[in-house]
């Protein structure tokens, strides 16, 4: 029974993201960063960034950077509009966990 509880606790849960879910930014972020409740297998994890039409933008996961509970990807310049981040990580318990969130980049102020 105790082993089963320990195994269940090992599933990775997203604790924090940058940008935050639902955020409106003045400019596109250079990186997407995710923090989980435990270690993840970065080499077998991914981040996708999709525009309003569902087209994927290049995102490069930085496998060697940061703490073992963080997944970070660099992204090319993101234009004004709504963006969806889809992530998938391999937990140290061997289970694949995925999720998504959205944020917006506000249009530039015109003079």
Identify the meaning behind each predicted range.
Residues 5-7:
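N-terminal signal peptide c-region/cleavage motif recognized by signal peptidases
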Residues 13-15, 23, 96-111:
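Extracytoplasmic/periplasmic copper-protein system
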Residues 28, 79-85:
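A glycine-anchored, Pro-Gly-centered beta-turn/N-cap motif
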Residues 33, 38-57:
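Short, surface-exposed alpha-helix to beta-strand junction/turn motifs within ectodomains of secreted
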Residues 67-72:
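Aromatic sugar-binding surface patches on proteins
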Residues 86-100:
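Short, exposed beta-strand-loop hairpins at the edges of beta-sheets
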């Amino acid at each position: 029974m105790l082993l089963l509880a320990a195994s269940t606790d090992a599933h990775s849960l997203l604790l924090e993201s940058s940008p935050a879910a639902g955020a409106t930014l003045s400019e596109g972020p250079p990186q997407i960063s995710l923090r989980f409740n435990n270690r993840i297998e970065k080499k077998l994890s991914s981040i996708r960034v999709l525009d309003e039409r569902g087209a994927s933008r290049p995102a490069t996961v930085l496998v060697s950077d940061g703490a073992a509970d963080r997944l970070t990807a660099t992204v090319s310049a993101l234009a004004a509009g709504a963006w969806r981040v889809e992530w998938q990580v391999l937990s140290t318990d061997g289970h694949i966990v995925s999720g998504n969130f959205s944020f917006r980049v506000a249009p530039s102020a015109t003079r």
